[in-house]
């Protein structure tokens, strides 16, 4: 066992213990909630072909009128919504699904413009597509 490495490791951990490191890490979620099935965000996939970027976002239980999509910058897309329960709370026996506000900012790998976004909500999936801004360089034989 290398006691010198252990001593250095302890020094490093003590530095973080004295700072606000763990407070900042746990700022948004308490340790006992790290593995909760409830989440106030959603998951998405990103695809590309030669001409378009495609984003598929899981939005179960979100109606179009409760959905907000906004381009914060050319590479940041804000998606907000509300997941509404199907039945009233007094009928609830067991609940595993999350209900309430959801929000996520998606970092886009390629720039987008608002007027080029095509958006459709279908069967609990939000489909977003926009054209790629790929530059083509002409080959000059004379060089």
From Swiss-Prot:
UniProt-recorded Gene Ontology molecular function terms: unfolded protein binding
**Alphabetical UniProt keywords:** Sporulation
Tell me the ranges covered by the sHSP domain, including all copies. Answer: 34-143
Query: According to the record, what induces this protein's expression?
Result: Induced late during sporulation by the sporulation-specific sigma factor sigma-K and negatively regulated by GerE.
Q: Does the keyword Lipoprotein apply?
A: no
**Top-level taxonomic group:** Bacteria
Cross-referenced InterPro entries = A-crystallin/Hsp20_dom, HSP20-like_chaperone
* Alphabetized PROSITE patterns for the sequence: SHSP
Q: Name one Pfam family in it.
A: HSP20
The GO annotation for biological process reads: protein complex oligomerization; protein folding; response to heat; response to hydrogen peroxide; response to salt stress; sporulation resulting in formation of a cellular spore
According to its UniProt record, which protein family does this protein belong to? Belongs to the small heat shock protein (HSP20) family.
Q: What is this protein called?
A: Spore coat protein P
Organism field? Bacillus subtilis (strain 168)
């Amino acid at each position: 066992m290398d006691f010198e490495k252990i001593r250095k490791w302890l020094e490093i951990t003590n530095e973080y213990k004295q700072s606000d490191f763990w407070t900042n890490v746990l700022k948004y979620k308490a340790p006992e909630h790290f593995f909760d099935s409830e989440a106030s965000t959603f998951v998405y996939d990103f695809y590309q072909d030669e001409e378009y970027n495609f984003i598929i976002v899981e939005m179960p239980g979100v109606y179009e009128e409760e959905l907000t999509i906004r381009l914060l910058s050319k590479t940041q897309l804000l998606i907000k919504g509300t997941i509404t329960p199907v039945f009233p709370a007094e009928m609830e026996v067991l609940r595993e699904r999350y209900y309430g506000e959801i929000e996520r900012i998606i970092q886009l790998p390629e720039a987008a413009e608002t007027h080029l976004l095509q958006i459709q909500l279908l069967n609990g999936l939000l489909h977003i597509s926009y054209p790629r801004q790929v530059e083509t360089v002409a080959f000059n034989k004379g060089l």
